[in-house]
Regions:
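Short acidic, hydrophobic short linear motifs in intrinsically disordered regions
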Residues: 29-43
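Minor-groove-contacting beta-hairpin "wing" of winged helix-turn-helix DNA-binding domains
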Residues: 71-78
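A short, conserved structural fragment
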Residues: 60-70
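Short amphipathic alpha-helical interaction segments
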Residues: 46-58
Length: 80
């Protein structure tokens, strides 16, 4: 049975996979949460920056990413 999280990530389809893999390839714990970084991901993956923001926002909402004290950065959350 698909959970709501699975359904939402499925909505992003291949875009989610491209963004996830690109972020993984950076080997960074802190991920920049700025328009500049979202445009950088767009240039590297071809996924529109607005979609990148939606993916990161949803990742924050479901706990894939965590907030930091600096609003310009998010972190990878530990896998539960």
């Amino acid at each position: 049975m698909m959970t709501n999280n699975d359904k939402m990530l499925a909505q992003f389809g291949a875009d989610w996979v491209k963004v996830r893999d690109y972020i993984k390839s950076l080997n960074m714990f802190y991920i920049s949460y700025t328009p500049t970084f979202m445009v950088r991901i767009e240039k590297e993956t071809g996924v529109p920056a607005n979609t990148v923001k939606s993916i990161l926002d949803y990742g924050l909402q479901i706990g894939l990413y965590g907030k930091t004290s600096d609003r310009d950065y998010i972190t990878l959350s530990p896998v539960k």
